[in-house]
Each structure stands twice: as C-alpha cells, then as structure tokens.
Regions:
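Structured C-terminal helix/loop/strand segments within mature extracytoplasmic catalytic/sensor domains
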Residues: 7, 57-92, 96-161
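Mid-domain, small-residue-enriched loop/turn segments at the edges of structured enzyme/sensor domains
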Residues: 1-62
C-alpha cells in the first residue's frame, strides 16, 4: 500500500509520516489512526470537508502554476491531479454536470457513508471549483448520491451559468 511504501515497508511509520504531513501543512482535522478497514480499536481515521477542499485546492493550484503560498509545495501534485481525473465512479459530483464540464474527484463509500471531493474544471465561464461532500449514518445511500449530484450541479450553475 501507499502507507507501507511511505514508511519504507513499515505501516506504522507510514501512518506517522501521513500524520506529520497533515500537521505540518495545517490539515488540523485529519488524522490516520489505522490502516483502511482495519479494526479501529487502536485508532480511527478522520478528516473534514475543509481539509479535503484545502488539499484539492493545493493540487489544483500547483498543477495550474498559481500557488501563491511558499508552503504550497506538494511532491507529485500533478500526478495526483491526473489520477483524480481518471476516476471511473461518476454517480456523485459528475453525475449531473453538462457533458463538456470535467471533474477530477475521489469518492469514498462504506456502509451508511457516501463521500465525494472533487475539482470541477473547464467550466463555461472559466470559474473552476473545488467541492467536497461528506456524510455518515445514512439510511439511503442512493438518495445521498443523488443529493451530492444535485448540489454539485447547483453549485456549478451558480458560478457558471
């Protein structure tokens, strides 16, 4: 896994490196306490829409060459942006966008959870956007997916129509 790679073959060292990066870059609502889907008796993983949005904004600005803060350096930002553009799950943020609008996003799904964070780009008026949706304790995940799609479309429309 990426965490194992970051830790030089040691998952705990990789998680520590992720947490240090988050602390050093002001992602104050993000922490990695365990590997994905591992028993959470030793810790939990959490983040916020604000931290996800900030991270995506940094990736976008570095890719566009518009980063203004000297702290806005992130090795591999351009590669991360390319990976986000390759997302195959289109049932949330991109679902109701006009066909010419592009979305680079990362979804997250668990039982009773539907998340999506993305960059809406190549828009009608050139106003690119970062949006992030996070949910938990859902009874109807299909309704949540539809709400994310509707809200994304409404946000796009507000700025670009």
């Amino acid at each position: 896994t990426l965490v194992n790679y970051l830790g030089g073959g040691d998952d705990a060292a990789g998680m520590a490196r992720v947490n240090k990066f988050c602390q050093d870059h002001g992602y104050t609502s993000t922490s990695m306490g365990r590997l994905l889907l591992a028993d959470n008796s030793k810790g939990d993983n959490y983040t916020s829409a604000k931290d996800c949005g900030k991270f995506l904004k940094t990736i976008y600005q570095i890719d566009k060459g518009t980063a203004t803060d000297n702290n806005d350096t992130l090795a591999g930002a351009e590669y991360m942006y390319r990976l986000l553009k390759m997302q195959t799950r289109k049932n949330k943020i991109p679902a109701q966008m006009p066909s010419e609008v592009k979305v680079a996003n990362k979804t997250g799904e668990l039982d009773h959870v539907e998340n999506d964070a993305g960059i809406i780009y190549d828009t009608a008026k050139g106003i690119d956007l970062v949006v992030c949706f996070m949910s938990q304790d859902l009874n109807d995940t299909a309704a949540a997916q539809n709400t994310i799609a509707q809200d994304s479309r409404a946000i796009y429309g507000y700025y670009n129509e």
